[in-house]
A protein has these predicted regions:
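C-terminal motif of bacterial Sec signal peptides marking the signal peptidase cleavage site
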Residues: 16-19
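Solvent-exposed N-terminal domain segments of exported/luminal and surface proteins
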Residues: 23-164
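Short, aromatic- and glycine-rich surface loops/edge beta-strands on solvent-exposed regions
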Residues: 162-181, 263-279
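Short, exposed coil/turn segments at beta-strand boundaries within extracellular/luminal domains
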Residues: 178-186, 290-297
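Short helix-loop boundary/capping segments
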Residues: 187-251
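Hydrophilic extracytoplasmic domains
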Residues: 250-306
Length: 306
């Protein structure tokens, strides 16, 4: 259960990266016309400042930021591709945070908030399970785990697990049934599925390693591309940078952008593309301030040409 919880936390609240990051945007200007590629804005990620979530070989490499609202509801469809093999995970989650009960790391840095259970949660009339909410973080070079409470989950890996189906470009019905006949329910809008491929050019030894990322464009909104390094021996994924760009289907990552990342210390580089939709729900009888998002994610792992 601990390993599963660590994995799930990678996908719970990647949406908060848009809202909670402290951006210092830099533009990467390519040779493509504006019809093909927009300028890219990126934030580098400090391992000293970010929470880390390790889960082994199927990592999406997404870090978890401290939630900005007391309710976070997320539905995700995640594809993880390595060479010719693709695994598919579908999940729906709901976490209710007690913002009067912060959890801090050594030195007083905020790690997160304790969670609470407000009733019974269902997605598409499937009752979600209550599972541990675990956070992992790096402290003095070591990975430590902290239990923040419990949250609600439906999870399917390929065809194994809960019978939850994430339907793209559609809706997922959410319901929270509390005490005293109080309840909240609404539809969560889902985005068009994202599917990507990555072309590699050059190598680390020649200092000319670069990548071209192509995906099925939506022509509206933005996508996030997370770049991470994956260590097979340590079963650990470390995020390097978050890139934001218009959803036009093309992004080029030049060697000049990669030169400061410690790629030589990792076996694979991971590109995680996320397309998401936000659902507005102002206030219900139980749910007040909230973040509600559905996301389609494609995570591509590539052996690093040394």
């Amino acid at each position: 259960m601990k390993k599963l919880s660590a994995y799930i936390l990678i996908t719970l609240i990647p949406l908060l990266l848009f809202a909670c990051s402290k951006p210092l945007p830099t533009e990467l200007v390519g040779n493509e016309s504006s019809d093909e590629q927009s300028s890219l804005e990126f934030n580098t990620i400090s391992s000293d400042d970010e929470l880390l979530y390790k889960n082994g070989y199927d990592s999406t490499g997404t870090d978890l930021s401290v939630p900005s609202t007391s309710v976070v509801i997320s539905a995700s469809s995640i594809k993880t591709t390595y060479k010719s093999k693709t695994e598919v995970k579908e999940l729906a989650e709901a976490a209710f945070f007690d913002r009067e009960m912060p959890v801090k790391r050594q030195g007083g840095k905020l790690l997160g908030y304790r969670t609470k259970l407000l009733g019974v949660v269902s997605f598409n009339n499937l009752q979600a399970r209550v599972v541990p909410f675990m956070a992992s973080f790096r402290e003095h070079g070591a990975i430590k785990d902290t239990l923040l409470g419990s949250y609600f989950l439906l999870y399917k890996n390929n065809n194994s697990g809960d019978p939850f189906n994430f339907v793209h470009d559609s809706n997922i019905h959410f319901r929270l049934k509390g005490i005293m006949n109080r309840s909240d329910e609404f539809e969560i809008s889902t985005p068009k599925e994202i599917s990507a491929e990555v072309d590699v050019s050059g190598s680390l030894s020649n200092n000319d390693l670069s990548f071209k990322i192509k995906w099925d464009k939506a022509l509206q909104g933005k996508i996030q591309i997370l770049i991470s390094g994956l260590s097979i021996s340590q079963k650990n994924t470390v995020p390097f940078a978050k890139i934001y760009t218009d959803d036009k289907g093309l992004a080029k990552i030049p060697s000049s952008f990669l030169k400061d990342f410690p790629l030589a210390n990792f076996d694979r580089i991971v590109f995680t593309l996320s397309r998401r939709k936000t659902t507005e729900y102002k206030s219900g009888s139980i749910i007040k301030d909230n973040t509600i998002v559905a996301q389609t994610i494609h995570s591509i792992q590539l052996d690093i040409p040394k």
